[in-house]
């Protein structure tokens, strides 16, 4: 991923959670500090070796910031020691952006769930909210480091052929520059489930 990332394709993806109230940045920072204790494998920098890139543990600490740049902007800067993820906020939204070399969608989902859980507990514990665990009690750092692709993927495994359905393509004239265009939609879960069941 690192060798292929550039201004046009940063290999960064974003997950976010929209709350019902404005985000308190100080509490979010405290929640992030707690979350990183559970996910220490996220405290990595990408280094360039003689033949390949590698991840190296670091002492950098993530700092919560108000959203200040375009979504999915570059996180990996060649020859610069920076974390490969970022937590920002905007009004009621908590954003988690991560360079794909660090984790996949599942890891990002677990990190964001833990972050939001910690945030909500810190904000609402005065109202009697009890702490809950979202992760298995016996999960270790080694469990977090497992590369599921290597564990489960096999090029020899036969897969049944399926008819390929093409996703809807938004057709528009390309604009100049390296700007990411964000499309956001809101849909009823019931309506989407009903339609997906109709289509099989």
What is each residue range found by the language model?
Residues 1-147, 189, 193-195:
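Non-catalytic N-terminal regions of enzymes
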Residues 149-199:
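Flexible, P/S/T/G-rich "lid" or insertion loops adjacent to the active sites of thioester-utilizing
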């Amino acid at each position: 991923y690192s060798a292929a990332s550039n201004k046009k394709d940063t290999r960064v993806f974003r997950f976010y959670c929209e709350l019902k109230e404005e985000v308190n940045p100080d509490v979010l920072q405290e929640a992030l500090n707690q979350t990183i204790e559970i996910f220490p494998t996220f405290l990595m920098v990408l280094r360039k070796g003689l033949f390949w890139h590698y991840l190296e543990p670091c002492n950098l600490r993530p700092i919560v910031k108000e959203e200040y740049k375009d979504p999915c902007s570059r996180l990996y800067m060649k020859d610069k020691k920076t974390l490969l993820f970022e937590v920002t906020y905007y009004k009621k939204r908590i954003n988690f952006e991560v360079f794909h070399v660090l984790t996949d969608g599942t890891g990002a989902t677990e990190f964001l769930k833990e972050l939001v859980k910690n945030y909500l507990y810190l904000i609402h514990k005065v109202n009697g909210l009890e702490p809950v665990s979202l992760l298995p009690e016996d999960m270790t750092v080694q469990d977090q480091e497992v590369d599921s692709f290597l564990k489960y993927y096999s090029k020899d495994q036969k897969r049944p052929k399926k008819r390929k359905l093409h996703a809807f393509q938004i057709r528009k004239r390309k604009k100049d520059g390296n700007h990411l265009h964000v499309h956001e939609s809101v849909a009823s879960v019931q309506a989407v489930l009903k339609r997906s069941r109709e289509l099989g």
